[in-house]
C-alpha cells in the first residue's frame, strides 16, 4: 500500500531548497500556482499569519524552518545569538494561536537547541531537526492513511459516499494529507464512490483546494455549500464524515475548521460515522478539554467583502476560524500511533503512551 500511496502523490506545498523555504501560495490556488521564497523568520511568520501556508501540520513544519532561517541571521549578527533567537520563537508562536502543531514544532526546535553539545554546528543541527519534522509528518500521513482506510473497509467493503470539510490534503501537511490521505487510500482500494467537499467559507478551502487536489487525482468529487451537509446526509447515503484537526485535547475534544461541530451533530442525528485524522503532534495533553482551547478570530472583512467590495453595509461580522467538537460526537480519532474509537480521557492517555507505528 505504501508504494501505491507514494505513486499517487501529486501535490506538495512546502520545499526546503538551498537554505530557502519555498511555500506554494495557497491564497491563489487553483487559478495560479505561485511559489514564494522566504529567507527570514519574520517572512515565515507573515506567511503563516496571512495564510500563504495553512493547515496545522504545514504551519508547524514551516515554523521549524523559520527557526533555521532565524538562527542563520542571528549567528551572522554575532553576539548572544541564542538570546536574540528567542524573538523569532515569539514571533512565530504569535502567528496563529489555535494550531498546536505550531507550538509542538517550536518546542521541538528549542529542545534540540538546548541539547546541542560543544563543537556542534548550530545551523546544521537545527536544519537537520526541521527536516526531520518535515519527513516525520509525511511518514505519519502514510500510516494514518492506511489505518483510516481499514476503518472504512471494516464498516463496508463496497464503494461509499464520504463528506469532508476544509482542506486536509498535501497542501495542509508535509505530504499526502491527513483526512484526504485516508480518502486517497480508500480510493486506491475501491472504497470511494464519491467525495462531497464542503466549500468551507469564508476562505473556500474546500472549493479552491480540496476539490482541486481530488480532481487532479481523478477521485470523483462534488462540491457543496456548507449548509447542504445535513441534506446530503439525509439523501445521498453518506457513510462517513472525515475531517482533520488543529488541536485535540486530553479528553478527545477536537478543534477544527469552523463548521466541523455542526457536521458532527448532524452526523450523529443521521447515523453517519465521524472520523478525525491528525498526527499525534496535534494532541495537546496539557489541555483537559475543548473549553481550554483558544479560538482564533479573523478580520470581519473576510465575510463583509467579496473581491474587495463591501456586500453588507453597516453591520459587524463574527468570524471565528475554528470550533470545538466534543469527544462524544466522534467515532474515531486516527493518528500515526493508532486509532482511538469513542475517545475519552483514558483512551487518549493510552494512545499517547504508545510508540509510533511508523
Swiss-Prot record:
Alphabetical keyword list: Amino-acid biosynthesis, Isomerase, Methionine biosynthesis
Swiss-Prot/TrEMBL GO biological process terms: L-methionine salvage from methylthioadenosine
Source organism: Pseudomonas aeruginosa (strain ATCC 15692 / DSM 22644 / CIP 104116 / JCM 14847 / LMG 12228 / 1C / PRS 101 / PAO1)
Segments passing through the bilayer: none
Similarity-based family: Belongs to the eIF-2B alpha/beta/delta subunits family. MtnA subfamily.
Enzyme Commission number(s): 5.3.1.23
SUPFAM superfamilies, per database record: NagB/RpiA/CoA transferase-like
Protein name: Methylthioribose-1-phosphate isomerase
GO MF, one annotated term: S-methyl-5-thioribose-1-phosphate isomerase activity
Source taxon at top rank: Bacteria
Amino acid at each position: 500500500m505504501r508504494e501505491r500511496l507514494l505513486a499517487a502523490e501529486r501535490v506538495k506545498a512546502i520545499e526546503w531548497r538551498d537554505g530557502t523555504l519555498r511555500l506554494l501560495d495557497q491564497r491563489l490556488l487553483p487559478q495560479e500556482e505561485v511559489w514564494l521564497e522566504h529567507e527570514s523568520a519574520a517572512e515565515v511568520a507573515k506567511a503563516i499569519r496571512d495564510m500563504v501556508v495553512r493547515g496545522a501540520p504545514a504551519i508547524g513544519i514551516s515554523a521549524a524552518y523559520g527557526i533555521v532561517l532565524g538562527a542563520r541571521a542571528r549567528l551572522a549578527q554575532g553576539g548572544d545569538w541564542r538570546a536574540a533567537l528567542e524573538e523569532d520563537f515569539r514571533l512565530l508562536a504569535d502567528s496563529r494561536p489555535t494550531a498546536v502543531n505550531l507550538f509542538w514544532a517550536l518546542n521541538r526546535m528549542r529542545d534540540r537547541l538546548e541539547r546541542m553539545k560543544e563543537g556542534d554546528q548550530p545551523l546544521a543541527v537545527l536544519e537537520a531537526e526541521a527536516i526531520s519534522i518535515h519527513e516525520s509528518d509525511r511518514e505519519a500521513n502514510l500510516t494514518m492513511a492506511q489505518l483510516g482506510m481499514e476503518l472504512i473497509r471494516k464498516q463496508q467493503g463496497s464503494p461509499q459516499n464520504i463528506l469532508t470539510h476544509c482542506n486536509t490534503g498535501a497542501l495542509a501537511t508535509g505530504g499526502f494529507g491527513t483526512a484526504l490521505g485516508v480518502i486517497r487510500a480508500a480510493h486506491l482500494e475501491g472504497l470511494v464512490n464519491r467525495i462531497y467537499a464542503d466549500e468551507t467559507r469564508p476562505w473556500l478551502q474546500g472549493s479552491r483546494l480540496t476539490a482541486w487536489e481530488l480532481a487532479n487525482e481523478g477521485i470523483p468529487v462534488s462540491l457543496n455549500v456548507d449548509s447542504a451537509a445535513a441534506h446530503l446526509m439525509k439523501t445521498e447515503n453518506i457513510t462517513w464524515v472525515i475531517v482533520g484537526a488543529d488541536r485535540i485535547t486530553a479528553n478527545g475534544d477536537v478543534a477544527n475548521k469552523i463548521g466541523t461541530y455542526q457536521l458532527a451533530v448532524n452526523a450523529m442525528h443521521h447515523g453517519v460515522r465521524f472520523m478525525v485524522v491528525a498526527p499525534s503532534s496535534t494532541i495537546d495533553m496539557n489541555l483537559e478539554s475543548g473549553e481550554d482551547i483558544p479560538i482564533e478570530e479573523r478580520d470581519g472583512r473576510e465575510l463583509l467583502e467579496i473581491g474587495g467590495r463591501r456586500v453588507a453595509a453597516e453591520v459587524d461580522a463574527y468570524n471565528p476560524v475554528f470550533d470545538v467538537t466534543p469527544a462524544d460526537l466522534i467515532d474515531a480519532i486516527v493518528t500515526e500511533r493508532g486509532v482511538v474509537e469513542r475517545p475519552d480521557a483514558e483512551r487518549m492517555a493510552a494512545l499517547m503512551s504508545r510508540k509510533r507505528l511508523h
